[in-house]
Amino acid sequence: MPVVSLAELLESGVHFGHQTRRWNPKMSQYIYTARNGVHIIDLVQTAQLIEEAYEFVRGEADRGKRFLFIGTKRQAAAIIKQEALRSGSHFVNQRWLGGMLTNWETIRGRVERLKELEELENSGALDKRPKKEASVLRRELGKLEKYLGGIKTMRRLPDLVVVVDQRREYNAIQECQKLGIPIISLLDTNCDPDLVDVPIPANDDAIRSVKLILGKISDAIIEGRRGGQAAVEEYEEDYDNETEYEEEGDYSQYAAEFASGDDDN
């Protein structure tokens, strides 16, 4: 049984790229056609590459590798957090702080500060501090939790990263390249496939597209760590009832068109 069907990809709008004038020519191999000035991603290739990514991720998870999900754009932030937590991974979904990986020792010091402040809060010790001091410390705690909360259990550098919106997360990509950390990334039509190790051509703006693909990657991690599809199914009910996302258009109308091979070119 395939990891994902063409119908699922179509219904989630995975095939919609950017306007043709905003493309990266290096993505031409993954582009099927153009419609009304918008590039359409070749979903046959996307489906195959998701299969390959799934097998790769499952194998790495089975070997005990640790994953970091990165995506700070509004559409992806909640999904990044949800799927990272579901698969027992780390995440950054608010802002990428320069040196988060390449200057890990310094960042780890800030993470320890976060844990220290959390302990003060949870133990009730902050309530015993002067009101002004407690207010300052709580503001510091809130800021650290916002930016570092997703990596507070990360004891060392991740073995692999999963990225949504390569262009927005370019600084993170550069840090991973410097450190030799493999990159799994959704690639919209304005991205550069040469910058990643495991490409997944896909719409990285639509919530349903991001949710579908990150969900599959998360499934692969769970299956790899816990040994089989049953482990994934154990989590599906909670996952389906989690965060609600705004509804997007119904893309199933494109299914017949895609299957027929008709295009504007």
UniProtKB/Swiss-Prot annotation:
Q: Which GO terms describe its molecular function?
A: structural constituent of ribosome
Biological process (GO), any one: translation
Per UniProt, which keywords does this protein have? Ribonucleoprotein, Ribosomal protein
Gene3D superfamilies, from UniProt? Glucose-6-phosphate isomerase like protein, domain 1 (3.40.50.10490), Helix hairpin bin (1.10.287.610)
GO terms for cellular component: cytosolic small ribosomal subunit
Q: Cross-referenced InterPro entries, in alphabetical order?
A: Ribosomal_uS2, Ribosomal_uS2_bac/mit/plastid, Ribosomal_uS2_CS, Ribosomal_uS2_flav_dom_sf
Q: Which domain of life is it from?
A: Bacteria
- Give the matching SUPFAM superfamilies: Ribosomal protein S2 (SSF52313)
What's a Pfam family in this record? Ribosomal_S2
Q: Which cysteines are joined by disulfide bonds?
A: none
The UniProt record lists the keyword Secreted: no
NCBIfam families from the xrefs? rpsB_bact
Family membership, please give it.
Answer: Belongs to the universal ribosomal protein uS2 family.
Entry-linked PANTHER family: 30S RIBOSOMAL PROTEIN S2 PROKARYOTIC AND ORGANELLAR, SMALL RIBOSOMAL SUBUNIT PROTEIN US2M
What protein does this entry describe?
A: Small ribosomal subunit protein uS2
